[in-house]
Swiss-Prot record:
GO terms for molecular function: DNA-binding transcription repressor activity; serine-type endopeptidase activity; transcription cis-regulatory region binding. Belongs to the peptidase S24 family. SUPFAM superfamilies: LexA/Signal peptidase (SSF51306), Winged helix' DNA-binding domain (SSF46785). Transmembrane segments: none annotated. The gene is lexA2. It comes from Pseudomonas putida (strain ATCC 47054 / DSM 6125 / CFBP 8728 / NCIMB 11950 / KT2440). This is LexA repressor 2. NCBIfam families: lexA (TIGR00498). Represses a number of genes involved in the response to DNA damage (SOS response), including recA and lexA. In the presence of single-stranded DNA, RecA interacts with LexA causing an autocatalytic cleavage which disrupts the DNA-binding part of LexA, leading to derepression of the SOS regulon and eventually DNA repair.
């Protein structure tokens, strides 16, 4: 397959995310709105390029006729690295060495994770995430309001539900025993990835 420009890579990831989360692809209007294009014809040019590059297939004359090309469909087995631990409680220091590689069934995850982290703590139990679980994380630097994220705050890592309020961020635990974390403007904060499923081992 051909290498994509950053813009087309972003459009392809948007298509893949919409299919994974909603069961159907975006329309040309959805793509134009998401990326600020002046018209659907600009979105159509990018879709045509993605199709020619072998990333997607398009059924003509259908409003939502985009689908992932066959080679990009999920493999029967995923090989995912475990990169350490993430705090479900107070943030903990990073632990990013590859601890092990696991062969996993893709059906465990809504989207294919880039890596797994082992949960330490109980602040996310109301979302069904428990101490010792392995959470699948899709690496990306942004997230929507309400998504579960792995975030780095002043060099320490935590898993929480993200609340966006204008230009401010709040990290919400899902256990009433814990208080929300209000991210201050002077703090070093960024999102490392979004939660896409978990594995619980006995």
């Amino acid at each position: 397959m051909d290498t994509l420009t950053p813009k087309r890579r972003a459009i392809f990831e948007f298509i893949r995310e919409r299919i994974a989360e909603h069961g159907q692809p975006p329309s040309l209007a959805d793509i134009a709105t998401r990326f600020g294009f002046a018209s659907r014809s600009v979105a159509r040019k990018h879709i045509t390029a993605l199709c020619q590059a072998g990333y997607i297939d398009v059924t003509p004359n259908q409003a939502r006729g985009i689908r992932l090309a066959e080679p990009l469909r999920r493999p029967e087995i995923l090989e995912i690295p475990v990169l350490g631990q993430v705090a479900a409680g107070a943030p903990i220091g990073p632990d990013l060495g590859i601890h092990e590689q696991l062969l996993l069934d893709p059906s465990l995850f809504r989207r294919t994770p880039d890596y797994l982290l082992k949960v330490r703590g109980d602040s996310m139990i109301d979302d069904g995430i428990f101490d010792g679980d392995l959470v699948g994380i899709l690496q990306q630097a942004d997230a929507r309001d309400g998504q579960i994220v792995v975030a780095r705050l002043d060099g320490e890592v935590t898993i929480k539900r993200l609340q966006r309020q204008g230009g401010t961020y709040r990290l919400l635990p899902r256990n009433p025993a814990y208080a929300p974390i209000d991210v201050q403007p002077e703090q070093d904060f960024f999102i490392e990835g979004v939660f896409c499923g978990l594995l619980r081992r006995d």
